[in-house]
Amino acid sequence: MKRNILAFMAVMLMLCMSAQTSQAQLKRFSIGPYVEAGFPTGDFSTTHNPGFGVGLGADVKLIAGLTAVGSVGFDYFKGKTIDNGNTKIASAKVIPVRLGLRYQLISILYVKVEGGTANFTGDYNNGTGALVAPGLGIRLLGLDVEGKYEAWFKDGTHGFFGLKAGYNF
């Protein structure tokens, strides 16, 4: 029994020591939550109010300055009542799944382009469409703030300007 406990303690000690030395190395992978605000444009702005979203993003460093990024989230845009209060548009509830690339321009400034699917749920435009989302942002330590334009393509274009803030671990 003592031998098992000593062996376990030795393994734990080695893991702790290796974790301390690996913290000095650069992280190649990070993951973290984000929140975003969306401001509809075009026809989407006539039928929906500004919305919000939450989600989880991840990134993997590839080569100098280039990073693969991905995220999954939930966006909500409340529908408007139009035509003198006679027509109520259903709220847009969307689950976007994005994959893309981020390129570091200078130390904290980056450009990013993402593509993927927009899964509409609920009564508004139910089904799956494509999405594209170019953006410009800053990343300082774990804090990530991005301005972007995102367009969902299903039965027309549903576009919005967004402000996204997240923290990566």
Pin down the residues of each PLM region.
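Outer-membrane beta-barrel channels and translocator barrels
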Residues: L26, K61-G65, I106-I108, L140-L143
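Transmembrane beta-strands of outer-membrane beta-barrel pores
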Residues: V35-D43, F52, V72-K78, K93, ...
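Membrane-embedded beta-strand positions of outer-membrane beta-barrel proteins
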Residues: I31-V35, G70-V72, L99, V111-V113, ...
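Residues that define the transmembrane beta-barrel architecture of outer-membrane proteins
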Residues: K27-F29, H48-F52, S91-V97, N126-V132, ...
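Short glycine/proline- and aromatic-enriched beta-strand/turn motifs that initiate or cap beta-hairpins
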Residues: Q20-L62, W152, F160, K164-N168
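Cleavable N-terminal export/targeting peptides
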Residues: M1-R28
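Outer-membrane beta-barrel domain signature
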Residues: T41-T47, D59, D83-A90, F120-N125, ...
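Structural signature of outer-membrane beta-barrel channels/translocons
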Residues: D59-K61, R102-Q104, G137-L141, G166-N168
